[in-house]
UniProtKB/Swiss-Prot annotation:
Protein's name in the database: Leucine-zipper-like transcriptional regulator 1
Pathway membership, UniProt: Protein modification; protein ubiquitination
PROSITE patterns: BTB
SUPFAM superfamilies in the record: Kelch motif (SSF117281), POZ domain (SSF54695)
InterPro entries per UniProt: BTB/POZ_dom, Kelch-typ_b-propeller, Kelch_1, LZTR1/Attractin, SKP1/BTB/POZ_sf
Gene3D superfamilies the UniProt entry points to: Kelch-type beta propeller (2.120.10.80), Potassium Channel Kv1.1, Chain A (3.30.710.10)
Species: Mus musculus
GO cellular component: Cul3-RING ubiquitin ligase complex; endomembrane system; Golgi apparatus; recycling endosome membrane
One annotated GO molecular function: small GTPase binding
Modified residues (N-acetylalanine): 2
Compartment(s) of residence: Endomembrane system; Recycling endosome; Golgi apparatus
Kelch repeat start and end residues: 76-125, 127-182, 184-235, 236-282, 292-338, 396-447
Maturation and modification: Phosphorylated on tyrosine upon induction of apoptosis, leading to its degradation by the proteasome.
Length: 837
């Protein structure tokens, strides 16, 4: 996805951490492995995942509105158009995000006619407005959609209409628009009679030489829709939900600009143990930041939810973002975190809070305020709304306006603080280990053909109890055979041998598995996923059915669910009979039921029974289909919760905590104290260990642990092992000092651990742990942190002096504290003397 004030883990997204938000720096393996030059910034910071209510737009500046657009340019938000409930608007408002002030933007030239449900994008130093709905909504006259294109130049305030020759997109409103590769792209919308799903693009570099082009889309094109958002991330355009009549869904689609192909992204929330996608909705917003898409608001089945949903583009999972605790305290000011303050004892991070609805707590306040107000304002969650608009500046999202309860237009502005950390590479690292087949120590002999597939005992025994038993049986058989042959001393201590540079492969026979589906199963054990086959292709569906059979036999609930999701989503008229027959042959009852129910549907049955494949079905299956059609069985919805099994992270956590002790094959020495571990796991996660085990494997199977010249504490060493085995980044702040340089020294594949260590140090120094951190800073020569700890001790000495750990400090550290106290008292006396003079 937690420790005290910890940052985001690999599970649900949570708030309550103060951060500069983007601690990710370029990963440079040539960087010094010492923390002596570590520079820390002790605030004040904005809280990660904090909502803040900013000054609303006053009526004398601009009306409350909905169905408008907002764009971000430099340090300002620009609001154009919309409606105030009575009339359409075409004013342009500007909100300065630095001083939180509203004003009317300077404009010259002829602006677009008043409109709403238009689109606005930024390209270069201009804003482009396309289409929308115009006319007089009060008298219900002259209402029509537009397909005009206007440019607003921020530098001069000049409005200009682009006159385009040739074919034009049909006039529309409530469409999606974005900029990519110097072009404006528009998709779908409403033309006054029907919803659309066509796409058009136009170059924005030179209006004299450009024209509209219709895009030939392919793939799984979204249904015709309107009132939906689009966002670009990872060179792809994403579309989520929207109004599609009877076809409205909560599907997420992605569009590849290069080959102009759409793909519907499958959801696997049951399998991954993550929350489901947001409800289907319309009138919502979606913005992109880092590798995430953020969806807020909209109308979802007659409700106005105010949860913020986050989609991870890399891992294809949805999460509900938990707001920081200070988002929920009305009237609270943002606390300062200055290192010179005597309130340094308040440097604790807030506990992670569970999400609460705020619409019943916070009322709407549109009272008149000045156009410029202090930054430190009441922190509140925005209420649910639709037809609002959102934009991103730096590391924050700004949401303005919209329609709230009782059809009231809003003039509120809210700010949401993003988080940004390097992604977890755990699954990728183990995937590379599987693909590379280095350090394999087990060979599975499969089926009657005795095909061989190699793997790693540590990964396999961590993920599958069934395969673990087979491996243990093979080890016991081999040990007995060697003992009978006289190759093993009878009195040798039990347990795995360590230190062999190239131990022989352990052979494990599995007669019930064939090589190809078993390799897919192995890929899942290493990565928690399988590479998606071609959807609907009979060969691929049958392969996954074989994998499904193995998952049932090996009791891999997680893989079982994944296979079922893929197969059920892939069943269509072309392959249903083949899949049904295969399911009957493999005795896969649930899949067979799914196929039978698919066949006997009114819209499918006549087509299926006229196929040639139907004539070749076995007689019992034909009889079952006919009887199912004549007398469908009663539906019995199951209330049984779905068992999704354990994840890779959960299994590796249990493995480190003791479940894998009998399979250790390397010993790590910390100050002479042994810690058994697993070579394959260390090599997968660290290029340092990979190179050592490949070329410089110690003969005695023991590796001394240090980080450069420094030996970490036992506690910090265990924190590092937790990161290596299952990607855990939460740890006590003192551990972060030891491990700050670990990503460079041990060659981790990105600086995720370092980013969390840096934030942990900046955030979580308190009176309660300052002495432990002082000791760690002294040992690691982290001078910046040591000065900060001494500063806190001096200003909070009354509290620190009562801590029992003070009496356990070394003599030198006690002298450092006395020196700092003397200096502080001297400076204070000088200041008082100067004031008296």
């Amino acid at each position: 996805m937690a420790g005290s004030g910890g940052p985001i883990g690999s599970g649900a997204l949570t708030g309550g951490v103060r951060s500069k938000v983007a601690p990710s720096v370029d990963f440079d393996h040539s960087c010094s492995d010492s923390v002596e030059y570590l520079t820390l910034n002790f605030g004040p910071f904005e809280t990660v995942h904090r909502w803040r209510r900013l000054p609303p737009c006053d009526e004398f500046v601009g009306a409350r509105r909905s169905k408008h657009t907002v764009v971000a340019y430099k340090d300002a938000i620009y609001v154009f158009g919309g409606d105030n409930g009575k009339t359409m608007l075409n004013d342009l408002l500007r909100f300065d995000v630095k001083d939180c002030s509203w004003c009317r933007a300077f404009t010259t030239g002829t602006p677009p006619a008043p409109r709403y449900h238009h689109s606005a994008v930024v390209y270069g130093s201009s804003m482009f407005v396309f289409g929308g709905y115009t006319g007089d909504i009060y008298s219900n006259s002259n209402l029509k959609n537009k397909n005009d294109l206007f440019e607003y130049k921020f530098a001069t305030g000049q409005w200009t209409e682009w006159k385009i020759e040739g074919r034009l997109p049909v006039a529309r409103s409530a469409h999606g628009a974005t900029v990519y590769s110097d072009k404006l792209w528009i998709f779908a919308g409403y033309d006054g009679n029907a919803r659309l799903n066509d796409m058009w693009t136009i170059g924005l570099q030179d209006r004299e030489l450009t024209c509209w082009e219709e895009v030939a889309q392919s793939g799984e094109i979204p249904p015709s829709c309107c009132n939906f958002p689009v966002a670009v991330c990872r060179d792809k355009m994403f579309v989520f939900s929207g109004q599609s009549g009877a076809k409205i869904t909560n599907n997420l689609f992605q569009f590849e600009f290069k080959d102009k192909t759409w793909t519907r992204i499958p959801t696997e929330h049951l399998l991954r143990g993550s929350p489901p996608p947001p409800q289907r909705r319309y009138g919502h917003t979606m913005v992109a930041f880092d590798r995430h898409l953020y969806v807020f608001g909209g109308a979802a089945d007659n409700t106005l939810p105010n949860e913020l949903h986050c989609y991870d583009v890399d891992f294809q999972t949805w999460e509900v973002v938990q707001p920081s605790s200070d988002s929920e305290v009305g009237g609270a000011e943002m606390p300062e975190r200055a290192s010179s303050s005597e309130d340094a004892s308040t440097l604790t991070s807030e506990e992670r809070s569970s999400f609460k609805k705020s619409r019943d707590v916070f009322g709407l306040d549109f009272g008149t305020t000045s156009a410029k107000q202090p930054v430190h304002l009441a922190s509140e969650l925005p209420s649910g709304r639709l037809f609002h608009a959102a934009a991103v500046i730096s590391d924050a999202m700004y949401i303005f306006g919209g329609t709230v309860d009782n059809n009231i237009r809003s003039g509120e502005m809210y700010r949401f603080q993003f988080s940004c950390y390097p992604k977890c590479t755990l699954h990728e690292d183990y995937g590379r280990l599987w693909e590379g087949r280095q350090f394999c120590d087990v060979e599975f002999v499969l089926g009657e053909k005795e095909e061989c597939v190699q793997g790693h005992v540590a990964i396999v025994t961590a993920r599958s109890r069934w395969l673990r038993r087979k491996i243990v049986q093979a080890q016991e058989w081999l040990a007995q055979k060697l003992e009978e042959d006289g190759a093993l001393a009878p009195k040798e201590a039990p347990g795995p041998a360590v230190g062999r540079a190239r131990p022989p492969l352990l052979r494990v026979a599995i007669r019930e598995a064939e090589a190809r589906p078993f390799e897919v199963l192995m890929q899942f054990l290493y990565t928690d996923k399988i590479k998606y086959p071609r959807k609907g292709h009979v060969e691929d569906v049958l392969l996954i059915m074989d994998v499904y059979k193995l998952a049932l036999s090996f009791q891999l609930c997680r893989l079982e669910q994944l296979c079922r999701q893929y197969i059920e989503a892939s069943v269509d008229l072309q392959n249903v009979l083949v899949v049904c027959e295969s399911a009957a042959r493999l005795q896969l009852g649930q899949l067979k039921e799914h196929c039978l129910n698919f066949i006997v549907k009114e819209s499918h049955f006549n087509q299926v029974i006229m196929m040639k494949e139907f004539e070749r079905l076995s007689s019992p299956l034909i009889v079952e289909i006919v009887r199912r059609k004549q007398q469908p069985p009663p539906r019995t919805p199951s209330d049984q919760p779905v068992d999704i099994g354990t994840s890779l992270i959960q299994d590796m956590k249990a493995y480190l905590e003791g479940a894998g002790s009998e399979f250790c094959d390397i010993t790590l020495l910390l100050d002479g104290q042994p810690r058994p571990a697993h070579k394959a796991i260390l090599a997968a996660r660290s290029s340092y260990f990979e190179a050592m085990f490949r070329s410089f494997m110690p003969e005695d199977g023991q590796v001394n642990i240090s980080i450069g010249e420094m030996v970490p504490s036992r506690q910090a060493f265990e924190s590092m092992l937790r990161y290596i085995y299952y990607g855990e980044v939460n740890m006590p702040p003192e551990d972060s000092l030891y491990l700050f340089a670990a990503p460079y020294y041990y060659g981790f594949y990105n600086n995720r651990l370092q980013a969390y260590c840096k934030q942990n140090l900046e955030m979580n120094v308190t009176v309660q742990n300052v002495l432990q951190i002082l000791e760690a800073a002294d040992k690691t020569q982290a001078l910046d942190m040591k000065r900060h700890c001494l500063h806190i001790i001096v200003h909070q000495f009354t509290k620190v002096s009562k801590l029992p750990t003070l009496r356990l400090l070394s003599q030198q550290l006690l002298l450092d504290i006395i020196d700092s106290l003397a200096s502080h008292i001297s400076d204070k006396q000088c200041a008082e003397l100067g004031a008296d003079i």
